[in-house]
Design a protein with these regions (language model features):
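Membrane-embedded helical hairpins/re-entrant loop segments and their flanking transmembrane helices
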Residues: 15, 41-77, 249-322
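Hydrophobic, membrane-embedded alpha-helices of multi-pass small-molecule transporters
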Residues: 16-28, 168-180, 197-198, 212-213, ...
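Generic transmembrane alpha-helix signature in multi-pass membrane proteins
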Residues: 37-43, 90-99, 125, 149, ...
């Protein structure tokens, strides 16, 4: 045993221990993987069949991505117990792209934008001088803030409730509040299993209550096949420059986040966190991050990223063996083959999802604030923060400020993440050079 670990990176635990550890990781990531496609589908008004397929492909692709990260093929992958899943960071750009060109534009931007992260993996040392922790913190905070609006909309009942006039009803808000409260209560439990499963338990209870309140009608459930067969480019692909730019900026930021997650994973796993071995591991992990997202776009799914919560699971279980990752990947791929998983969650009322995601998205914003607070907030940093938040939140709150510009420019800069992110990068470079 080293560094408090029961099983190290290259150890092969007995099958019983491997399966138990893999199931705990799965419990920690399952909801996080299926939430983005559910939010995106609800916002863009996709039908149950499409939503179900997107959920299934998110699970399937997350399994493939996790296997590539853990196995490490040549210079692709980090070779750690590193789990990948559908990223929350891209929800706002995806919704923007979907409004412009539907699923084809989303998948086109997912694939082309991924080359930004692939490029970062090749010039990692130089990229980190430009994308500093301050810049990353600002962008992560903007991502969280933009997502909170999406979460609140779901709490009120979503787009369908806005159309039928029930948005913000007592029932919708009550269900959302119940789910949020249950998650908080279970998360504070001294029982580690209740704590790990707090989100799933909260959603399950909220789903059951909403069913008895007449908010779920399984009578409209469509016919579906027993198995899902992944079909590359099922919905087609198109390329919109404004969507690609928005995606590329977030890809650059997620590359730096992945670097931090891989560093933490290496530290927890008792592996080096400096030197050539670590640098190759980090570059391979970020490269896999980008390549896996490219694969995701081709297989009708959304960008993937390394999941930080699994680092905590390694600490909790004392199991850092990357062979556990193979079983996590297998479970995810297996779940992705069965449409019933996606169908069941497709019928989940918006307030149930909203109650859970509101807390998740708030956590994203608070993580960004934490990154910013970890830096020295001097005069230069204050200026960068002020410029970035003013411009990012400005266009987010009042996008009509860009109404006189050409449509392509409007589409690019109407995203607070894009505008605020570019403002953070440019102002950070200019002010630093100036000084």
């Amino acid at each position: 045993m080293q560094n408090g670990l029961i099983y190290g990176l290259e150890d092969r635990p007995p099958l019983k221990d491997t399966l138990f550890a893999a199931m705990q990781h799965l419990l920690a990531i399952f909801v996080a993987i299926i939430t983005p496609p559910l939010i995106i589908s609800g916002t863009l008004g996709f039908d149950v069949e499409t939503t179900s397929f997107l959920v299934s492909m998110s699970l399937f692709v997350s399994g493939i991505a996790t296997f590539i990260q853990c196995k490490r093929f040549g210079g692709v992958g980090c070779g750690l117990l590193c789990v990948q899943g559908t990223s929350f960071s891209f929800i706002s750009p995806i919704i923007m792209a979907g409004a412009i060109g539907g699923l084809p534009a989303i998948f086109g931007a997912t694939m082309v934008g991924a080359f930004a992260e692939i490029l970062v993996s090749r010039i990692l040392k130089y990229a980190m001088k430009i994308i500093t922790p301050l810049v990353s913190g600002i962008v992560v905070t903007l991502i969280g803030i933009s997502l909170i609006k999406v979460g609140i909309t779901s709490c009120g009942g979503g787009a369908s409730a806005i159309e039928n006039g029930t948005f913000g009803s007592y029932l919708n808000l009550g269900i959302a509040a119940l789910v949020l409260l249950l998650i908080v209560l279970f998360n504070r439990s001294s029982n580690r299993y209740l704590r790990m499963g707090s989100i799933i338990i909260g959603i399950a209870i909220g789903y059951a209550v909403s069913f008895f309140c007449g908010m779920v009608d399984f009578g409209t459930m469509p016919e579906y096949s027993i198995f899902n067969v992944p079909v590359p480019f099922k919905y087609g692909v198109s390329f919109d420059i404004s969507a690609i730019v928005a995606f590329a900026i977030v890809y650059v930021i997620t590359a730096i986040e992945a670097y931090g997650d891989i560093t933490a994973n290496s530290l927890i796993s008792g592996e080096p966190v400096e030197g050539q071995t670590f640098l190759k591991r980090a570059q391979g992990g970020i490269l896999a991050d980008g390549l896996n997202s490219f694969i995701a776009g081709a297989l009708n799914s959304f960008p993937n990223s390394v999941f930080a919560q699994n680092n905590g699971m390694i600490q909790l279980t004392g199991v850092a063996s990357r062979y556990v990752g193979y079983f996590i990947a297998l479970f995810l791929v297996f779940l992705g083959f069965f449409p019933i998983v996606g169908v069941i969650f497709s019928f989940m009322p918006d307030p149930v999802l909203g109650g859970a995601t509101l807390l998740m998205f708030g956590t994203v914003a608070s993580a960004g604030v934490k990154i910013i607070a970890s830096q020295q907030i001097d005069r230069k940093a204050t200026l960068v923060i002020a410029i970035s938040f003013s411009m990012g939140l400005g266009v987010e709150l009042y996008p009509d400020i860009l109404m006189q510009f050409p449509e392509t420019i409007r589409n690019i800069f109407s995203s607070g993440i894009t505008t605020g992110g570019l403002a953070a990068i440019i102002s950070n470079m200019v002010i630093r050079i100036k000084e």
